[in-house]
Amino acid sequence: MSNEKALDAIRRIKLENDTSAGNLVDLLPIEVQKRDFDLSFLDTLSEARPRLLVQGADLADFKAKVKADPSYCMYDDFIKNSTEKFYETAPFEEPQAYPPETVDKASLWRPYWRQMYVDCQMAMNATRNLSIAGIVNEDDALIAKAKAWTLKLATYDPEGVTSRGYNDEAAFRVIAAMAWGYDWLNAHFTDEEREIVKNALITRLDEIMHHLKVTVDLLNNPLNSHGVRSISSAIIPTCIALYHDHPKAGEYIAYALEYYAVHYPPWGGEDGGWAEGPDYWNTQTAFLGEAFDLLKAYCGVDMFNKTFYENTGDFPLYCMPVHSKRASFCDQSSIGDFPGLKLAYNIKHYAGVNQKPEYVWYYNQLKARDTEAHTKFYNFGWWDFGYDDLRFNILWDAPEEQAPSNDPLLKVFPITGWAAFHNKMTEREEHIHMVFKCSPFGSISHSHGDQNAFTLHAFGETLASVTGYYGGFGVDMHTKWRRHTFSKNLPLFGGKGQYGENKNTKFEGHQDRFCIEAGGNITDYDTESDIKMVEGDATASYKFFVPEIESYKRKVWFVQGKVFVMQDKATLSEEKDMTWLMHTTFTNEVADKSFTIRGENAHLDVNFINESADNITSVKNVEGFGEVDPYEFKDLEVHRHVEVEFKASKEHNILTLLVPNKNKGEQIEVSHKLVGNTLELTVDGETATIEL
């Protein structure tokens, strides 16, 4: 394949991914809270520079405070940790295209894609940080270095490999880097240099805006997650830098504000939940938070004026728990790791915005633990924590830390269909939690076919977990394992699961609307009683591949903060066998009617406690990732799951008792008695009654 054909092939793949999620505004399962937006401020914006973060009118005062106290706003850490490393680094040459022989398989070209955007992230960090340091320190040598980076980036071909249409992650970073250089160094460019950078910015800006307004029509297709992110990461900083210099800058800012005021967040409701899961909450929040900060600093507008922003820090607090790995849902580049440091910074940001002390606790927990954050690609390829500290301290103040409750609790995000049970939330070795998902967004975009799925963590280990690895969007592990119901803690009916296809799976006849039509709903919950409960209805989720299904609901009770009871009820118009799945990274010990997941420090006993146990035909331990190319998990641990087969029936009513215990020490003692629809459960001598 020639280089030009390879470039075109990647552009076609990129466009296919870009237009994923289709025009689905008629199917949006939530109503976005709308806010009026007043654009009159555009008529009075200052021409002074800088504008990005520190304002021209405030620059002298900021310099004086830093000179008097280098630790002011953690500026000294910003220099030491984020800027000095670029003092002797020469500006990078333009990246090369992916090797032609890789373009036919995502798992082959994804490493080159990732390395390219990581390099562009380094270029952005260098350009921005050296620009700030040079101006604040009044250091001509640093200013010269920052100029060199800015001018080098301006030579990158805007239609080449760092264009939005080839690698948008690289494109966003390149344009943002130049925007910082153009703004902070403006007075230090010659007229010719300034024009070169300005023209490069405008060319790239217009490409992105054409994509938003024409290719994906974002205002009518608000679910296009990369389109959304291009506003915060590229459009807003660039238009602030170009304001008064480019006649369309104001128009583009108005477009961005209309999107945020009227159409955002399409993935989250007023409850603060986020349908795409905590990793994509993380990336969206990171770029959005910075963009809103830059708008606050330059334009004086408060974009955090929706109920969603008041509550959304609760989502990672409860659904990406501090102490667990593999315990949440949707696409996750961090799968297999504890919640990352950027998540901590994002929740701290909302601590500043909303003065919520529990968020500071979460931040402090992650900050203390993640001492090697700089070694992980999803950090160094994306974030700069020294800059984050500087920005936060210039604009916000955080309250004093306060730990969340250690009592048994259930937090529900009913609009987006997420829930989380917790007990002893602040004690790592005692913490028990279950994260549950039944989302009306179905499997669209970065969501999966996993409505009514759960994970269970106890005593330091996620025993019932999500399995597999992250290799990038569209690789085998993504399209043949992670997106599908058979990789989740869920049932299959006649061997079939929920609709989890997308354009990358190459499923014949796929339409993106099928993904949302396969949504579920949290239909009932009780957060107040001693026994906490949540119920999800995932009937529609299975309908595409199991048209005979008439109803499928899963109900979970949390008893005394120690054990879980789960009921799966399904009715079908024809008899179908049912395969009840539970996945783990640990060892399974199977028996005729039960099984145990055995971790290093804890275990989970799973027993089927009603008459459904008589319908079990087999309990099997299975290893592997189905049809995933073994190349993608070479030298990585192969995970396991249990398949419990129930004989064919028109009705399935599976009642399961899940009891986590430590491997050593005192054990939770549980007994039960089932009479009709009443379950009497005795846990460590205390009796509780559940009406099924």
Show the residue positions of the predicted features.
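Carbohydrate-active enzyme catalytic cores, enriched for enzymes
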Residues: V216-L219, L242, Y280-L463, Y525-T527, ...
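Mature N-terminal, pre-catalytic/accessory segment of carbohydrate-active enzymes
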Residues: S2-D76
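N-terminal carbohydrate-binding/catalytic regions of secreted carbohydrate-active enzymes
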Residues: A60-M124, V136
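CBM-like, beta-strand-rich accessory domains located in the C-terminal region of large
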Residues: Y470-L692
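Catalytic Cys-His active-site segments of thiol-dependent hydrolases/isopeptidases
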Residues: A464-Y469
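Aromatic-lined, polymer-binding surfaces characteristic
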Residues: Y72-Y75, W113-R326, Q332-S333
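Residues that flank catalytic or metal-binding motifs in active/ligand-binding sites
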Residues: A48, A170, V174, I231, ...
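Short, flexible loop/turn elements at secondary-structure junctions
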Residues: D58, N423-M425, C438-G442, P491, ...
